[in-house]
């Protein structure tokens, strides 16, 4: 009897395979980082071949650590960094260009061109998203327009597009030898091409973008058998049965299945998702309307999302670019050497600002500096930036939904940072709750795969698995909270309109 599920978590900085048991507990993990490629300012790329090779290797790591074989595995689930665009040749399996990552801002001129008629919200009533460099659609256009010969090959029907889950699925299920070219509704909802109501590609929008429909994957639910593993002998014949974009997967892994439930993931960026149930809620406050999940033939569940571009990656930047710390966990020790931020505020608009501002022209700023400020204050200001940005997104959720959040469920790498979690509770004025299993992204993908294959029977099975690990209660008084928020918002305004038109369009 197969007692376990493998979740492949293809993230922004690494690819992991995590094996879960029926209780949702982690049995073993394999993980490999991949190279972050920065060819020019604002450009971020990954090598898709490296990602696929790493995927195969981490599956082997996880299985060998747990001393398991394919016969012990009931199903495979995939979760992924969303929006990151891969275009490859279906005949050779070779990518035509590196994957263009969600953080990449090179497509701003394409966004401006598309927004010239109808503005950045031109397609928002249909797809739930503003025109922005963040989403896959403009990245595909850039590859079609800038890589030699690609437009002609795409028109001939030789090229396929997918976000990284599609790339991994296609390779896992056979690649050039019958690989399944599919995506799920959550990932499809991040392209700018999918109609939120019909859950299908919009021909009229594809025509405006100039993207051949033949490139696009088939849209499926988040929980069904897409195909069986072929090429990886370690998991041969195991069904691939769950796909969720990483933030939707984390929401699913937090058992936030019902309207009004939410979670905030602290990773490279931060992503707050608020479940709106079967209702499509169009934001008036800078949030995205997106798919939450769709289980097999069931009705789709929708969500509001606040995406923050730079949170955990600010800590990486302090480590790698400035050498302020030598490892990410040191940021907390450094922040604890001071009582407060010393009047310094760090707005990490390193790739513009996402929700709720959507300002591609913003750039990072460290403000409020005096001779008093030291690196401890800067470390604290960097951590606090994550909490302030989360507060602004939550304010937008409250305004759109009319529901005030009573507590915030959290997950992701940064929730190990107790200093940050306490400040988050302080600046929100509501408790922050951490689950026992912090790897909720991979867990969500495992849940989707397990539901499709009968490993778990229903959502109640999954709710029983969720357990609280720790809770932080707010300690800051309201006057101090208001003062800090006022200064933060003042700091944010200093980052606007930083990119000159000649630079942006050059």
Curated annotation (Swiss-Prot):
CDD domains in UniProt: ASKHA_NBD_FGGY_GK (cd07769)
Record comment: activity regulation: Inhibited by fructose 1,6-bisphosphate (FBP).
The protein's Enzyme Commission number: 2.7.1.30
NCBIfam families for this protein: glycerol_kin, PRK00047.1
Pathway(s) of this molecule: Polyol metabolism; glycerol degradation via glycerol kinase pathway; sn-glycerol 3-phosphate from glycerol: step 1/1
Pfam families linked to this entry: FGGY_C, FGGY_N
Function: Key enzyme in the regulation of glycerol uptake and metabolism. Catalyzes the phosphorylation of glycerol to yield sn-glycerol 3-phosphate.
Residue positions binding ADP: 12, 16, 268, 312, 413, 417
Residues the record lists as binding ATP: 12-14, 268, 312, 316, 413
GO BP annotations listed: glycerol catabolic process; glycerol metabolic process; glycerol-3-phosphate metabolic process
Family designation: Belongs to the FGGY kinase family.
Keywords, comma-separated and alphabetical: ATP-binding, Glycerol metabolism, Kinase, Nucleotide-binding, Transferase
Residues the record lists as binding glycerol: 82-83, 134, 246-247
PROSITE patterns from the UniProt entry: FGGY_KINASES_1, FGGY_KINASES_2
Gene Ontology CC terms: cytosol
Reaction catalyzed: glycerol + ATP = sn-glycerol 3-phosphate + ADP + H(+)
Name of the protein in its database record: Glycerol kinase
GO molecular function: ATP binding; glycerol kinase activity
Ligand binding (sn-glycerol 3-phosphate): 12, 82-83, 134, 246
């Amino acid at each position: 009897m197969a007692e376990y599920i493998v979740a492949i978590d293809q993230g922004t900085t690494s690819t992991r395979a995590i094996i879960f048991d029926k209780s949702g507990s982690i049995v073993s993990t394999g993980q490999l980082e991949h190279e972050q490629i920065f060819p020019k300012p604002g450009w971020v790329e990954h090598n898709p071949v490296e990602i696929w090779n790493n995927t195969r290797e981490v599956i082997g790591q996880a299985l060998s650590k747990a001393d398991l074989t394919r016969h012990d595995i009931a199903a495979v689930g995939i979760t992924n960094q969303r929006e990151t665009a891969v275009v490859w040749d279906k005949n050779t399996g070779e990518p035509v260009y590196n994957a263009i990552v969600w953080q990449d801002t090179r497509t701003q001129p394409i966004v401006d061109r598309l927004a010239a008629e109808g503005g950045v919200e031109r397609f928002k009533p249909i797809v739930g998203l503003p025109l922005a460099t963040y989403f896959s659609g403009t990245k595909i256009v850039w590859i079609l327009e800038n890589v030699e010969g690609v437009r002609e090959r795409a028109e001939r029907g030789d090229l396929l597009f997918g976000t990284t889950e599609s790339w991994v699925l296609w390779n896992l299920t056979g690649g050039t030898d019958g690989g399944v070219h599919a995506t799920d509704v959550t990932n499809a909802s991040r392209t700018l091409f999918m109609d939120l109501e019909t859950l299908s590609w919009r021909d009229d929008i594809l025509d405006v973008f100039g993207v051949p429909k033949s490139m696009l994957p088939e849209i499926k639910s988040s929980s069904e058998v897409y195909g069986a593993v072929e090429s990886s002998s370690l998991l041969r014949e195991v069904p691939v049965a769950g796909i969720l974009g990483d933030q939707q997967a984390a929401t699913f892994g937090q058992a936030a299945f019902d309207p009004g439930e939410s979670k905030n993931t602290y990773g490279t960026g931060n992503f707050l998702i608020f479940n709106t149930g079967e209702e499509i809620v169009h934001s008036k406050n800078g949030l995205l309307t997106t798919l939450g999940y769709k289980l097999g033939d069931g009705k789709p569940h929708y969500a509001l999302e606040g995406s923050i571009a730079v949170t955990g990656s600010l800590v990486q930047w302090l480590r790698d670019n400035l050498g302020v710390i030598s490892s990410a966990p040191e940021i907390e020790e450094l922040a604890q050497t001071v009582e407060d931020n010393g009047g310094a505020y760090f707005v990490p608009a390193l790739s513009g600002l996402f929700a709720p501002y959507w300002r591609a022209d913003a750039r990072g700023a460290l403000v409020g500096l005096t001779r008093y400020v030291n690196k401890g204050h800067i470390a604290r200001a960097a951590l606090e930036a994550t909490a302030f940005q989360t507060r602004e997104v939550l304010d937008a959720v409250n305004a759109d939904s009319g529901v005030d959040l009573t507590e915030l469920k959290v997950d992701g790498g940064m929730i190990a940072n107790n200093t940050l979690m306490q400040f988050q509770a302080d600046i929100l004025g509501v408790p922050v709750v951490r689950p026992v299993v912090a790897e909720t992204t991979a867990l969500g993908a495992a849940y989707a795969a397990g539901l499709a294959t009968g490993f778990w029977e229903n959502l109640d099975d999954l709710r029983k698995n969720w357990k609280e690990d720790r809770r932080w209660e707010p300690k800051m008084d309201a006057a101090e909270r208001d003062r800090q928020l006022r200064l933060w918002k003042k700091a944010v305004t200093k980052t606007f309109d930083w990119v000159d038109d000649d630079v942006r369009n050059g």
